Amino acid sequence: MERVLIVNADDFGLSKGQNYGIVEAYRNGVVTSTTALVNGEAIDHAAQLSRELPALGVGMHFVLTLGKLVSEMPGLTRDGLLGKWIWQMAEEDTLPLDEIAHELACQYQRFIDVFGREPTHLDSHHHVHMFPQIFPIVAHFAAQRGIALRIDRQTVLNADDLPSDLRSTQGFSSEFYGEEITEACFLRILDASAHRGEASLEVMCHPAFVDNIIRQSAYCYPRLTELEVLTSASLKAAIAERGYRPGCFLDI
């Protein structure tokens, strides 16, 4: 059975170092797709680079935890900025869902304005779209527009509630992250997916070159390690040996 492998690099547009790392991992490695933060400091730079790489799938990285909003959103911002207090609000069930739905639409339009096309798919920064309160909003938004959505099926409480026409990969992994960023880890993800019989798999990653913006991130130097692993010739060969076909979300 042929299996589609999507290696998606998050955080396109966060910084020039992030952008260049993603492009390097695409040109000389196994990355096949990326998702862009439309409020990132280097989003215009990301769009410029993407025009030189028409085969690179570019989706939208919905942001509710970092930087400035595209719309007005007093219910979630503090001093005009987003932050990680969204987790506490989710636990207290005080999220401004109407504002979030409006911000999603505004970020989507901003993506089209910057990139000149619709995104290939949607996911989110820090996986906020998987919050139980937010997921239905994003899932129906994606289904209405016919674009794919990253779904962590271990997080979705009731798969029966998914829109019938919503596209996603059968498998998703965020395990290539943190302390163990190795070729062996990456291949274990593939082997586990194959064992489950999944015909399509998305692996999340964050390859980057370190610059001043990336240095401010709690997840900084591991991005360089990711880049090293993702551009290794041995990893590319091992993926091919396992029968995976590189693809993007337009292929599912």
Curated annotation (Swiss-Prot):
Pfam families assigned: YdjC
Binding site for Mg(2+): H61, H125
UniProtKB keywords: Carbohydrate metabolism, Chitin degradation, Cytoplasm, Hydrolase, Magnesium, Metal-binding, Polysaccharide degradation
Cofactor(s), by name: Mg(2+)
Single Gene Ontology MF annotation: metal ion binding
Catalytic activity, EC: 3.5.1.105
Reactions this protein catalyses: N,N'-diacetylchitobiose + H2O = N-acetyl-beta-D-glucosaminyl-(1->4)-D-glucosamine + acetate; diacetylchitobiose-6'-phosphate + H2O = N'-monoacetylchitobiose-6'-phosphate + acetate
Primary localization: cytoplasm
GO CC annotations, alphabetized: cytoplasm
Pathway annotation from the record: Glycan degradation; chitin degradation
Domain of life: Bacteria
Gene Ontology process terms (BP): chitin catabolic process; diacetylchitobiose catabolic process; polysaccharide catabolic process
Keyword Cytoplasm: yes
InterPro entries with a match to the protein in the record: COD_ChbG_bac, Glyco_hydro/deAcase_b/a-brl, YdjC-like
Cellular compartments annotated: Cytoplasm
Subunit structure: Homodimer.
Entry's family note: Belongs to the YdjC deacetylase family. ChbG subfamily.
Known role: Involved in the degradation of chitin. ChbG is essential for growth on the acetylated chitooligosaccharides chitobiose and chitotriose but is dispensable for growth on cellobiose and chitosan dimer, the deacetylated form of chitobiose. Deacetylation of chitobiose-6-P and chitotriose-6-P is necessary for both the activation of the chb promoter by the regulatory protein ChbR and the hydrolysis of phosphorylated beta-glucosides by the phospho-beta-glucosidase ChbF.
Protein name: Chitooligosaccharide deacetylase
Taxonomic lineage: Bacteria, Pseudomonadati, Pseudomonadota, Gammaproteobacteria, Enterobacterales
